[in-house]
Amino acid sequence: MEKRIAVIGIIIENMQSVEKLNSLLHEFADIIVGRMGLPYRERNLSIVSLAVDAPQDVISELTGNIGKIDGISVKTAYSNKIFND
């Protein structure tokens, strides 16, 4: 199975959406290598970065679902290297 490493950048502008986001991330916990969250109180938003290791379609499924949550923006950067596990 071909896997990719990716970094997912998430900006949370609606704090009421955090519970939905955390629930979704829990569903995909097995592909998350690391997570860093930064509250930016001066701007009333939070920034989350995820490092993931999974097939590209699974990463796309996760980011697509994140993008459907109200008040959340998401972008993904993929590594060029493909791993065959």
PLM feature segments, named:
Residues M1-D85:
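Long, contiguous binding/interaction regions
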